[in-house]
Amino acid sequence: MFALSARHALRRTRIFAIPRFFADSRQDSDNPDKRYSGPAATMDNKSEKVTVNKEELRKRLTPVQYQVTQEAGTERPFTGCYNKHYEKGVYQCIVCHQDLFSSETKYDSGCGWPAFNDVLDKGKVTLHRDASIPGGNILLLIAHPERIRTEVRCARCNAHMGHVFEDGPKPTRKRYCINSASIEFVNADPATSSPPVATPTAAPIAQQ
């Protein structure tokens, strides 16, 4: 009888916890003080909060870039232009041009998205619990709360980058799974730079 009561208590705890996880995953994206769309020339490369003008951003970004960075979308696997891109340089946020990742930490994880085992500086990204569910299966999340993912955003403009997982290589054991649509590459040697090639794709899907 006691075991049965404990089981019911655990079930109720999980159910009531889910709305809190959803609220946590949304609260920062609704903050208007974290938005930016102005030209890169007016910005330095520090993680200072900036304001995003959504209308100007729609004009500057492609539909896929906008959906990924502003609506937390996800490009289809193996379609991003940086998935198999290994030139030496730095990957910046496509929205505010802050340096986020280095080619030195990029590796082929086989997941279909650009993968890095570290960021240039921990202060340049923010991490958030992501309770969004591929396919909308909330019962799956209730049964397996450990599947709640960790979302990665740009600390300066709050743009969605992707997610980070604990299955990467040493020494960090991290896998920053990043959308190509959320970043742009700056070559260490512009003279040897070649444009990345992207596979044509439809609209992003909310799955990563």
From Swiss-Prot:
UniProt xrefs under InterPro entries: Met_Sox_Rdtase_MsrB, Met_Sox_Rdtase_MsrB_dom, Mss4-like_sf
GO molecular function per UniProt: peptide-methionine (R)-S-oxide reductase activity; zinc ion binding
Cofactor note (record): Binds 1 zinc ion per subunit.
Tissue: Present in the embryonic nervous system (brain and cord) in neuronal cell bodies, along axons. Also present in embryonic muscles in motor axons. Localizes to growing bristle tips where it is distributed in small puntae. Present at and at sites of actin localization.
Predominant subcellular localization, coarse grouping: cytoplasm
Taxonomy, superkingdom: Eukaryota
One Pfam family linked to the record: SelR
Region annotation (Disordered) ranges: 27-48, 189-208
Residue ranges, compositional bias (Basic and acidic residues): 27-36
Annotated active site: C177 (nucleophile)
Family annotation (Gene3D superfamilies): Peptide methionine sulfoxide reductase
Enzyme Commission number(s) of this protein: 1.8.4.12
Summary of the function given for this chain in its UniProt record: Methionine-sulfoxide reductase that specifically reduces methionine (R)-sulfoxide back to methionine. While in many cases methionine oxidation is the result of random oxidation following oxidative stress, methionine oxidation is also a post-translational modification that takes place on specific residues. Acts as a regulator of actin assembly by reducing methionine (R)-sulfoxide mediated by Mical on actin thereby promoting filament repolymerization.
Protein family per UniProt: Belongs to the MsrB Met sulfoxide reductase family.
Protein name, as recorded: Methionine-R-sulfoxide reductase B1
UniProt organism field: Drosophila melanogaster (Fruit fly)
The encoding gene: SelR
